[in-house]
């Protein structure tokens, strides 16, 4: 069981809550920010997905393997490279860990073993999944609901839902909306949100029905979504290239009221603020960019400040 020593970068006041460090997955390691210190772990590795849990931290390393960090800071490889698949996203759920991959597969990590979910490979509508460039589809993001339901976002294949812990899967949304991220809202049972190429998609009935909101957006192409209290935030750009990217916010319950976040932010970003790069904790909202910047808001996205810069390209971030 290898243990990787924390390498300190700098000690200074960061403004991050001491109890919930900010963890940033970059192309060159996992960067930690506490209230007074910064350090890097897994140096030299690309960290492409992060998932905190009660028993530690789960990450995808170099897109190929799953690593676990226990509460003592020890790292262990729990799923090495698997069948030449790229591992895209990870979701701890009730003692197991769900992983989404390239070629649109899912598998569980259970007791150190790997169990592929065959029912997902035969899900209704799978033969219609595609990518805009003609390649094989991916599982891009996942979420868990309060009643035990699971949601898996296929790019491009919509959002599939399981209500029996992964034994069966059903499509829930128009797959042509091109979903990039799906999330649930912890204190809103039944609410599911998705960042799509057509704007923000919302369901209030666990995915049975959906509505789109794109009012006031400069463009509908959205890559990331998060909820901070009663506020929903999305990242939007002019398209896959990421030109004219921005963050928008609105009340969770008031469709049609998006406002562009501009206080403390550049007018536009030149690259997409991507899936997994926009996260919240209580009143705090944080996002990272592909050129190594982090921006922080302490009032649900109303006012922002640059929190860090000159990091390696950021793939994902989260609070522990």
Feature map (PLM): residue ranges:
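Extracellular glycan-interacting surfaces
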Residues: 1-320
